[in-house]
Amino acid sequence: MTHHPDELEIWFLTGSQHLYGPEVIDQVAEHAARIVAALDASPHLPVRVVSKPVLTETDSIRRALLDATATDSCVGVIAWMHTFSPAKMWITGLDALRKPLLHLHTQANQALPWAEIDMDFMNLNQAAHGDREFASVQTRMGVARKTVTGHVEDPEVARRIGLWARAALGRHALAGMRLARFGDNMRNVAVTEGDKVEAERRFGVSVNTWGVNDLVAVVDEVADADVDKLCEEYADSYDVAAELLPSGERHESLRYGARIELGLRSFLTEGGFTAFTSNFEDLGGLRQLPGLAVQRLMADGYGFGGEGDWKTSVLLRTLKVVADGLPGGTSFMEDYTYHLVPGEERILGAHMLEVCPSIAEGRPSLEIHPLSIGGREDPVRLVFDAAPGPAVLLGLADLGERFRFVGNEVEVVAPTEPLPNLPVARAVWRPAPDLRTSTEAWLMAGGPHHTVLSTALGAEHLDDLAEMTGTELVLVDADTTIRGLAKELRWSAAYHRLAQGL
């Protein structure tokens, strides 16, 4: 499934004014084009950057930002004040902007030509205070934005702009997302519930429910020839258990798993859905709880949440888009159990079946095992250990009055010992700053037990996404203390309640 359509772009807006004359404006445009070309050539940018005409007056600024807001292909705006652009000209435009904004504080030249500097040079290259003017009005208006300082030849500048651009792509995907719930939430579970109307108002995602037997009807219509072809793909991609091979006694179970995948994929494609949920308590006429099918759809970029958890499904799809093209993987995850030996503390995460193979180390095995819940036939699933490396965990909580992201920086590690009797995919990680602080902080913040684990993303991606969506982010990292977090949560609650009342 395509994550970053070719037509998507970021608009680069350069501010100036008519005071300096047309020759200076032409130079400003030339310098802006060079900066855009450098950004466009950077491997850090996942989407093209498009230079727009230099903006010099209130009406053209307002029109440019209205156009950015109304243009579906524009996922965000980068703004730079090359010369001095009086910021009162930007007020109505900034007030109309509804796309993510990055304020690039840069200049055309990296080194000053000391012996050649005259007042013409000073008038042209005055972003040092032109951007301060621009930032002051943004702060007064409460404009959400990211600020990046430095010359575009500095790889760190392009890297940080690239992080923001990825978050903007995620926000764009979120704003147009359609999610299909097959059945309802797991009975009596609190954390998988949430306000779907507020989610659509806040994020733009449309969450609706279909009967499981609507899916079953599509599954039952899948052609045998298509099942044959998909089973061949399984054999090429995974280490298939002997009993599931064509000569094995349980090959029919694999064929039914393939039938579920083909039917589910068809249903989602036809409906324009990029995320979905299932619930083992509501399987209708399905003979298996979807396992392999869900894992492979996640690997292709779909969002998923178990037990009807649409919030985590939304989050997974969003972060899949943010991470597209980066090394590592991104998966649905659940904290399951702890290793509490002093000095060796770590968390074992898994789920009944549905962990994405994008985080796998090596070639997954395709197996069949009993499942004690759901009351259906034994489901097929991929089994693997997650690849070691730095990662982030992120959950989305509905606090009633607002949504909150809760995140944790972690280190995925190899299992301390082999897990020969655990018939599901799994990940083991050490949370920052330590298990005790991490878990106490997570519980204090009301973080959910379903999360997204990503070895492709870092904390700055999460910061940028939270800023763009106007969502609180509680991030547990190496610097977190329980005392400090308790204060942060109190201050944050006061801030958000006050902000909603204004």
Curated annotation (Swiss-Prot):
EC number: 5.3.1.4
SUPFAM superfamilies tied to this protein: FucI/AraA C-terminal domain-like (SSF50443), FucI/AraA N-terminal and middle domains (SSF53743)
Entry keyword Transmembrane helix: no
Co-factor remark: Binds 1 Mn(2+) ion per subunit.
Binding residues annotated for Mn(2+), in chain numbering: E307, E334, H351, H450
First-level EC class: isomerase
Any Pfam family: AraA_central
Example of a GO cellular component annotation carried by this entry: cytosol
Keyword vocabulary terms for this entry: Arabinose catabolism, Carbohydrate metabolism, Isomerase, Manganese, Metal-binding
Catalysed reaction, written as an equation: beta-L-arabinopyranose = L-ribulose
Alphabetized GO MF terms: L-arabinose isomerase activity; manganese ion binding
Superkingdom of origin organism: Bacteria
Xref: InterPro entries: Ara_Isoase_C, AraA_central, AraA_N, AraA_N_sf, Fuc/Ara_isomerase_C, Fucose_isomerase_N/cen_sf, Lara_isomerase
Essential cofactor(s): Mn(2+)
Biochemical pathway: Carbohydrate degradation; L-arabinose degradation via L-ribulose; D-xylulose 5-phosphate from L-arabinose (bacterial route): step 1/3
GO biological process assignments: L-arabinose catabolic process to xylulose 5-phosphate
Family membership noted in the UniProt record: Belongs to the arabinose isomerase family.
PANTHER family according to UniProt: L-ARABINOSE ISOMERASE (PTHR38464:SF1)
Function: Catalyzes the conversion of L-arabinose to L-ribulose.
Entry-linked HAMAP family: Arabinose_Isome
Protein name according to UniProt: L-arabinose isomerase
Protein species of origin: Nocardioides sp. (strain ATCC BAA-499 / JS614)
Phylogenetic placement of the source organism: Bacteria, Bacillati, Actinomycetota, Actinomycetes, Propionibacteriales
